[in-house]
């Protein structure tokens, strides 16, 4: 019975979940790096994370046609760079998706601020590519890029690795930082101290990657999604291509005090008491 597994069923689930990695095959991705306002980053990054030396931010739109966990969906995301100790990663501010199981897995397991989008699209244009994310009737992200250069997968990995100080390898590893928490049933605080989760993803390009030093990214806020609070000061780099990505298991690296974190806990939900 699915509502109550027998001992054999429980054993199988435990075996399969132990160290499980989530794999995205032939992921079509448009990813950009830009400089934002350092004062904004200081305001929104919770301790023990610290703003990185440079006020970088990243955004992407992706289509996932095949995964090893049964979900086929589209996704958009927005991060600002932040450091934990000496490790630079991305503090995730928004990650709309088009599939409920992708939402549940990313949000409840790793703490990603996932919400269901109305529509997420990624389409080729005459000279490039265009991505869009619409949620609750508002286009939160509009991203377009004209192709300027094409490089082999190995060169793309080398260039991306240079951004994060990585040695050349088979793939580019990115760190995501998220805070995992749940409101208590009495709505007076949290069930437990909010936990800082570190999760690493390996990006492996498949074939040639299109690059551009210029792109157009428009971020817009709605009543429930404040993406427009992140200024796009200077476009730095954009890329488009097909990737085989692997999300590795995460780990809890810190806990924070409830009152210290409370101000940062309200962008994952739409309703804000007035």
What are the residue ranges of the model-derived segments?
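Interaction-surface and assembly-scaffold signal
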Residues: 2-3, 8-13, 108-274
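Short, structured protein-protein interaction patches enriched in aromatics and acidic/basic residues
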Residues: 52-83
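Beta-strand elements of well-folded, non-transmembrane domains
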Residues: 82-84, 99, 137, 183
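Short, solvent-exposed aromatic-acidic interface loops
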Residues: 93-104
């Amino acid at each position: 019975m699915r509502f109550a597994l027998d001992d054999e069923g429980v054993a199988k689930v435990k075996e399969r979940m132990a160290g499980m990695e989530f794999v995205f095959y032939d992921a079509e991705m448009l990813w950009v790096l830009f400089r934002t306002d350092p004062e904004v980053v200081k305001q929104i990054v919770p301790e023990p994370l610290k703003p990185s030396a440079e006020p970088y931010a990243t955004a992407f739109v992706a289509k996932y046609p095949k995964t090893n966990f049964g979900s086929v969906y589209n996704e958009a995301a927005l991060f600002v760079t932040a450091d934990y100790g000496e490790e630079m990663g991305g503090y995730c501010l928004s990650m709309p998706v088009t599939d409920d199981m992708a939402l549940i897995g990313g949000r409840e397991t790793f703490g990603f601020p996932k919400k269901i989008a109305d529509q997420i699209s990624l389409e080729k244009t005459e000279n490039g590519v265009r991505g869009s994310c619409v949620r609750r009737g508002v286009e939160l992200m509009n991203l377009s890029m004209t192709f300027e250069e094409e490089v082999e997968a190995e060169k793309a990995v080398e260039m991306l690795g240079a951004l994060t100080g990585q040695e050349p390898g088979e793939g580019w590893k990115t760190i995501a930082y998220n805070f995992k928490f749940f409101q208590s049933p009495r709505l007076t605080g949290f069930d437990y101290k909010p936990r800082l989760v570190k999760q690493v993803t390996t990006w492996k390009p498949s074939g040639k990657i299109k690059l551009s030093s210029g792109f157009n990214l428009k971020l817009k806020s709605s009543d429930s999604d404040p993406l427009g609070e992140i200024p796009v000061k200077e476009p730095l780099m954009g890329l488009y291509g097909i990737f085989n990505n692997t999300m590795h298991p995460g780990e809890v690296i810190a806990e924070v005090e409830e009152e210290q974190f409370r101000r940062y806990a309200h962008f994952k939900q739409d309703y804000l008491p007035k």
